Curated annotation (Swiss-Prot):
Similarity comment: family membership: Belongs to the HisA/HisF family.
Assembly notes: Heterodimer of HisH and HisF.
Enzymatic reactions: 5-[(5-phospho-1-deoxy-D-ribulos-1-ylimino)methylamino]-1-(5-phospho-beta-D-ribosyl)imidazole-4-carboxamide + L-glutamine = D-erythro-1-(imidazol-4-yl)glycerol 3-phosphate + 5-amino-1-(5-phospho-beta-D-ribosyl)imidazole-4-carboxamide + L-glutamate + H(+)
EC number annotated for this UniProt entry: 4.3.2.10
Gene name as annotated: hisF
Protein name per the record: Imidazole glycerol phosphate synthase subunit HisF
Primary localisation category: cytoplasm
Organism of this sequence: Campylobacter lari (strain RM2100 / D67 / ATCC BAA-1060)
Lineage of the organism: Bacteria, Pseudomonadati, Campylobacterota, Epsilonproteobacteria, Campylobacterales
A GO term, aspect molecular function: imidazoleglycerol-phosphate synthase activity
Cited InterPro entries: Aldolase_TIM, His_biosynth, HisF, IGPS_HisA/HisF, RibuloseP-bd_barrel
Keywords: Amino-acid biosynthesis, Cytoplasm, Histidine biosynthesis, Lyase
């Protein structure tokens, strides 16, 4: 059995880490380098950095902070936001990122997934999916969620898009469940179950973690990683305590 991963998510805006609720009303959480160092030293298995404005504003990720993060931490990290080409990905990987993640650019150009997988290997290519459950319990994929004024339904349904990106060469999927984001009431287990059944690649749950038990629930469903932000940024959950709790519950985790 593969070791499960605890992942901290850092939404980056103008070199600062921010956190919103349901992808809105972001508040400042601190300096990106200092937070990255804190997590690297305190037991997080992996970091994901989302430049939340890059795709929406059609900008490139600032390479300076990516390089600085790589110099200051000793754990794997993934970078996302505005990656629209092989050259964009190559530059970020050259600056020290272990993986790159694409979201809205993949919706605009699905073949980008295949090109990146071919150029850099599937292990480097993560697809982020921002999924929203509407009033009819329909699971819909949203795009440009980094800007609440531009965020809208992409026209795709979540389960169909999951199947498509896996076929195109995604090495991992991060499922960002928008309804739960920042609410700290637990991951959407029903949605995770549906996605796990059709997703043959590593799956990371994102959106809703508020207690140690929420991570346990997700891992019991078979996800490979559980991602959280506000509970870690605000130190509401101690990472080492979380890992010991999970180990005691029979989850294979790196202590």
């Amino acid at each position: 059995m593969l070791t499960k991963r605890i992942i901290a998510c850092l939404d980056v805006k103008d070199g600062r880490v921010v956190k919103g609720m349901q992808f809105k009303n972001h508040e400042d959480m601190g300096d990106v380098i200092e937070l990255a160092k804190f997590y690297s030293q305190n037991g997080i298995d992996e970091l994901v950095f989302y430049d939340i404005t890059a795709s929406a504003k059609n900008e490139r990720i600032n390479r300076a902070w990516v390089s600085k993060v790589a110099q200051n931490i000793s754990i794997p990290f993934c970078v996302a936001g505005g990656i629209k080409s092989e050259d964009d990905a190559k530059e970020l990987l050259a600056n020290g990122a272990d993986k790159i993640s694409i979201n809205s650019p993949a919706l605009n150009d699905p073949d980008l997934i295949s090109r990146l997988a071919k150029s850099f290997g599937v292990q480097c290519v993560v697809v982020g999916i921002d999924t929203f459950k509407d009033e009819n319990n329909e699971l819909l994929v949203y795009k440009y969620t980094g800007d609440e004024n531009k965020s809208h339904h992409s026209g795709k349904k979540t389960l169909e898009w999951v199947k498509q990106v896996c076929e195109l060469g995604a090495g991992e999927i991060v499922l960002n469940m928008m309804n739960q984001d920042g609410m700290r009431k637990g991951y959407d287990l029903d949605q995770l179950t549906k996605v796990r059944q059709i997703c043959p690649v590593p799956l990371v749950a994102s959106g809703g973690a508020g207690a140690k038990e929420h991570f346990l629930d997700a891992f019991k469903l078979g996800v490979d990683g559980a991602l959280a932000a506000s509970v870690f940024h605000k130190k509401l959950i101690d990472i080492k305590e979380l890992k010991l709790f999970l180990k005691d519950q029979g989850i294979q985790i790196r202590i």
